[in-house]
Swiss-Prot record:
This is Chorion protein S36. The lineage of its organism: Eukaryota, Metazoa, Ecdysozoa, Arthropoda, Hexapoda. Keywords: Secreted, Signal. It is found in: Secreted. Residues 1-20 form the signal peptide. Residues 235-253 have a biased composition (Polar residues). It comes from Drosophila virilis (Fruit fly). The gene is Cp36.
Length: 293
């Protein structure tokens, strides 16, 4: 009973103190927002003022001081914003931004930025003629390479190390030495059992299928008909007609007959040399045994 009496007296004495500090819900609504603002920082300013003795400026004053700008800086920012707004409202810029003219430059800028930052190492920047299309071969792993094309690619293009780029369709097996060999092949012309990597190209709705071959791998290297004679001309080096002409060098009949009719001692020798068809070069001494000497 005595405990309840003391509790009631304490509640009556504490009521005026609570109303003085925080105010009643009806009359102190404004002050409640001021001292206990809503949001994630509720009550933070009150604690800061209590800890610093009221010397810390309020959050509104800090924000106002931070937003003070220099006149020249404010003027420059205004000009930039005006230019940006005018550029966005320009129909020519909108058309250019949505067209294919700027897509290639954006892709090249992105690649150049990655290369400068060391994110991409160019393996062979000119493995294909730049007049045909532009692309980069970059390593994406230990045994993987990735081809980034910045322009639509022709149907079939190949570049062999030490040989110029050429259109391809068939050719003998070849061992790749040096840089990898890249094939640009349309989906309708895939004819080899190799892994095909589909590379999306900007400015083109048709994907490009790329074959990447590692150095030292034996592959079927297609060659175009216009380039095939350059690589497969056994006639120019082997020419059996020019080098294997036993008729011109081994004609023992003509020399042997003249030698046998003119001198009896030279006839048997010329016939003996002429009998060996496998050694036609030894028939040449026959003219020296002619009657003219």
């Amino acid at each position: 009973m005595q405990l309840g009496l003391w509790f009631g007296l304490f509640a009556v004495a504490a009521a005026p103190l609570v109303s003085a500090n925080y105010g009643s819900p009806g009359r102190g609504a404004g002050r409640q927002i001021q001292y206990l603002p809503g949001g994630p920082s509720e009550g933070l300013e009150e604690y800061v003022n209590a800890a610093t003795g009221g010397s810390q400026p309020s959050a509104n004053q800090l924000t106002a001081q931070a937003e003070i700008q220099i006149v020249g800086e404010a003027r420059r920012l205004g000009r930039v914003q005006a230019q940006l707004q005018a550029l966005n409202n320009n129909p020519t810029y909108q058309k250019l931004k949505n067209s294919e003219d700027i897509a290639e430059s954006l892709a090249e800028t992105n690649l150049a930025s990655n290369i400068r930052q060391g994110k991409i190492n160019v393996v062979s920047p000119q493995f294909v003629d730049q007049h045909l299309f532009r692309s980069l071969l970059v390593p994406s792993g230990h045994n993987n390479h990735q081809v980034i094309a910045t322009q639509p690619l022709p149907p079939i293009i190949v570049h062999q190390p030490g040989a110029p780029p050429a259109h391809v369709n068939s050719g003998p097996p070849t061992v790749v030495r040096g840089n990898p060999v890249i094939y640009k092949i349309k989906p309708s012309v895939i004819y080899q059992q190799e892994v095909i990597n589909k590379v999306p190209t900007p400015l083109s709705l048709n994907p490009v299928y790329v074959k990447v071959y590692k150095p030292g791998k034996k592959i079927e290297a297609p060659l175009a008909p216009v380039v095939a004679p350059v690589y497969s001309q056994p006639q120019s080096y082997g020419q059996p007609q020019a080098y294997n002409q036993p008729q011109a060098y081994s004609q023992p009949q003509s020399y042997g007959n003249s030698g046998s009719s003119g001198a009896g001692n030279s006839g048997p020798s010329s016939d003996s040399y002429a009998a060996g068809a496998e050694t036609p070069l030894y028939a040449s001494p026959a003219p020296y045994g002619s009657p003219s000497y």
